[in-house]
Design a protein with these regions (language model features):
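Intrinsically disordered, low-complexity tandem-repeat regions
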Residues: 11, 28, 35, 84, ...
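Short helix-capping/linker turns of helical repeat alpha-solenoids
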Residues: 8-10, 15, 23, 28-32, ...
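Intrinsically disordered, low-complexity linker/propeptide segments enriched in Ser/Thr/Gly/Pro
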Residues: 1-5, 111-113, 128, 167, ...
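Intrinsically disordered, low-complexity repeat tracts enriched in Gly/Pro/Ser/Thr and acidic residues
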Residues: 54, 59-61, 95
Length: 178
């Protein structure tokens, strides 16, 4: 928690070096949120030199300890080739694991895999179901994806009123797609 306060700048200015130091202390005790945050720092180069390989190491450790955000981030790394070779099947597996905790981003990404057939056959019904679950958590990208389903009849009947409502809800949460 203290590391997070340094990160957001409790005294008015962020101190990423101090945040990294505190996250590293917590990570040494297998605190998964610290491991995941360090992974993100290394992926983005926030307060540290950007290093995709090191980011993946932190994500792996947190994912092995059950952190759903790290599991999703690891799926994204496999999907996009961040610090790893692109492997859509591994990405799909990590999104599935993270989705078991109902992490909205992972569930929405899983929906995209079903909709587009990124790691297997296209399954529009499963895509729709994933988007619905993630949208129920007020996750704007999933709300937009679900709106597209209603707009285009993907996994469901066309319902332009529902599509409009979902786009509007996403826009109210500052989604550029809403």
């Amino acid at each position: 928690n203290l590391a997070n306060l340094y990160e957001i700048g409790v005294d008015g200015e962020s101190n990423f070096a101090k945040a990294v130091e505190l996250y590293e202390e917590a990570a040494a005790m297998n605190y998964t949120r610290a491991l995941c945050n360090l992974g993100l720092y290394y992926e983005e180069g926030t307060g540290v030199e950007q290093n995709d390989k090191k980011a993946v190491e932190y994500y792996y450790k947190a994912a092995e300890l059950g952190d759903e955000v790290a599991q999703c981030n690891l799926g994204y790394c496999y999907e996009m080739g961040i610090g790893l070779e692109v492997n859509m099947q591994k990405a799909f597996e990590y999104y599935q694991i993270s989705s078991q905790s109902h992490y909205p981003r992972a569930v929405s990404n899983l929906g995209l895999f079903y909709e587009l057939g990124k790691a297997g056959p296209i399954d529009e019904q499963k895509a729709f179901e994933c988007y619905q679950i993630a949208a129920d958590s007020q996750y704007p990208p999933a709300q937009c994806n679900l709106a597209c389903c209603y707009e285009d009849g993907i996994g469901t009947d066309i319902d332009l009123q529902k599509a409009f409502e979902l786009y509007k809800a996403a826009a109210q949460r500052n989604s550029t797609r809403g």
